[in-house]
UniProtKB/Swiss-Prot annotation:
Family: Belongs to the HSF family.
Gene that encodes it: HSF1
SUPFAM superfamilies attached to this UniProt entry: Winged helix' DNA-binding domain
InterPro entries: HSF_DNA-bd, WH-like_DNA-bd_sf, WH_DNA-bd_sf
A GO cellular-component term linked to this record: nucleus
Annotated source species: Cryptococcus neoformans var. neoformans serotype D (strain JEC21 / ATCC MYA-565) (Filobasidiella neoformans)
Subunit structure and binding partners: Homotrimer. Homotrimerization increases the affinity of HSF1 to DNA. Interacts with transcriptional coregulator SSA1 on chromatin.
Source organism phylogeny: Eukaryota, Fungi, Dikarya, Basidiomycota, Agaricomycotina
Descriptive protein name: Heat shock transcription factor
Ranges of compositional bias, category Basic and acidic residues: 350-372, 399-415
Keywords: Activator, DNA-binding, Nucleus, Stress response, Transcription, Transcription regulation
DNA bind region: 78-168
Compositional bias (Low complexity): 11-23, 31-42, 189-199, 209-233, 452-467, 497-511, 522-550, 616-632
Chain spans, region Disordered: 1-59, 181-262, 350-554, 599-652, 736-783
Biased composition (Gly residues): 753-765
Amino acid sequence: MTTNLYAIAGPSKPTTPTSTPSPRSEPPSPLKSLTSLPTNPLNSHGTSTPNTLTNQLSSTGIGISKPGLSVDENGEVMKVPAFLNKLYTMVSDPEVDDLIYWGESGDSFFVPNAELFGRELLPRWFKHSNFSSFVRQLNMYGFHKVPHLQSGALKNETPIELWEFANPYFKRGQPQLLTKVTRKNNRPSNSGVGPSSSVGGSGAGGGMSTRSASAAAASGSASGQIQQAISQGHEAGNHSTSGKYLITDGTTPGSVPPSHTSAGPLIAPQTLDLSAINSGIAAIRQTQASIATDLRKLQASNEALWRQAYETQEKQRKHEETIDLIVSFLERLFGTEGEGLKGLKEAMRRGVGVRRDRDGREGRDSRDSRFAEDDDGGQKKRRRVGIDRMIEGGTGDGTGEHGEIESPTSDDRLVEIGSNSEYSIPSVKRTSSSSHPISLGQLGSSRFTALPSEDPSPSASGPGSTSYEGLHTTQTNARGAGADVNVTDPTLGMNHLSPLSDTDPLLPSSSNALAPYSSHLPFPSSNSNQSNSFNPSNPSSAWASNPSQPLLSPTSAAAAAHAYNLDPSLLQTTIGSLLQSPAAAQMFLNSLSASAQGQALASHSHPHNPSPLNPNPNGNASTSASASAHGMNTGGMGTGSGTKDVDPTLALFSPLPSHSSLTSQSNDLLKSYSDALTVGEGVDNLQESIDSLVRSMGLDLPNGGSSVGVDVGDGAGVGTETGEGDGEFNVDEFLQGLAKEGEEEGEREVEGDGGVSSSGAGAGAENGRKEDVIAQSGLKSES
């Protein structure tokens, strides 16, 4: 028995027998590939067509054919919706696998490029090209999107997203399951109307189409099917266990399932994913908080570094200003010529000096920089010419016998001379303030007249004792040490430098620097054989009557000034002021010319130096006085002969040098003078370099707490005064001390009450060099 399909679910309008649906709207159904269907099914017209959907009733075995129709296991005819039919055909077409294709398991399909899929493939099967509408239709038929890891919230979405959709009844190679895919409907359904009744009703009426019947059946059983799909996971797929969700955008009515049917399965997976997302967000927040903490620490450290750099810059600026003030003050105080700053730096480097007690005794502290071990194990002094050397004479404690020249060149003779000899130039240093000025007689006797031995003996301490014997004999030191000195040795003349230079003469002397000079002065009870051309009218009777009187007392200074016929105020004029003030220097020269020895030089009639060639060991009064009055290596000096043009500074020598000896040794004097000029230029260059270095880097100050005192006007020159101060150098006290001493010096220069300074800048001024040359020539002429 054959059943007419039009009678069962025919179209609402009558159609011609030859009409066929358009391939665009009604594609061939995939149900034609079912193996249970007959090979040549017949339609109502008795023709066979490949585009006809056929099926056979299980009870009769008679086939039926209709596009989009299928027969279920109960024998009921079901029509597959066109959307599902088109979708199955698109996914199964291998020509469009680049746009849509089945998954490997065949349970889902993929859309790799949604934009390209909607632009190229959707218009072929549908009347639109909107991919969002396609997704909404999939949601209406129960399809859901399978989430992927790359599409999660913890990763940025890629420009091209891979879409995967799945449905429990949409599988590859099983098109018969499409009849179980139903469309969702939110409209209330009639509970009394079932699929069979709707089909029967439509069959009875004869006017309802198959599409309407299927829609009615779907609306009547939508709620039951959804509940059945949820409760039976093996039959409809359990959403909670599969981790799949319904697709919806919230704009299409009916797209959201009822809350009482879908809320339960969707809560558990969403809760799990939200907890993971929350944990990830918490980790991100923790990391961000740690990064913010590190940034704050770095910012604080940066601010601390900038603050420290600023403070360091301020300290450096203050130090530079302090150093500039110190250097400016020192330059203003000492000037740029001579040995000013160089001597001060040398004294500051050593940090120690020589101090003399009030009773005349000297104490010299140990200086490691001035002593060096020689090959024999002995200590040999090395002394450097400078202002500090001119004030540091005095008796030493050396034990050597002869002074040794460090280098055979004349430069070494001018700069550095071995002072291992036991004879040295006495030091003239004030013991207190300017209340006890140093007289010229004492200065001359201590510097140019007599050379004290470093280890005095009691036998040579008398004021009238003599310490020299004949020139062609071997003299024995007054202290009885057995050190024989041959005064006729020509090599001794090489060490004869200017009395103003700081060198060590090589002649013995008595222990008292002023005693030999006092021996040649006429006393009322002295020997009548004593002859002296510049004999004053008994100027030293106080010394003869009271030998215990201090030699550096005001009485002795006045006596010496009276003996030389000099103005006492000139004795208090410093050498530095004489070199810097031409008027003071001229006044001093005029006073020397008017003195007793200056008049003796101008007269040319009185012998200044009787022949000292008397080998009498007892010592004639005349010869011993002359030898003692000279106080240096006087070898072979005959009768004095002068010229009309005699330098008045020769009056400082006692006895006066021989002019013929000076003339005979003019070549040596010129060479020494040229060497001195060369050394002076080198010293000036060195001074400029030191000044620039001091300006840029600062001064090397001592660490022992010694304060440096600069005494120019009181006879102390540039020296050091060591104190018990603390171990930290105070710059403010240092500047105040320098300023105070500078003011005192200026007052003394103005008032003329300062002491005679033993420190001079002879190397920086021509007058000083001239005195050095003359004195040196006098010493060499005697040899």
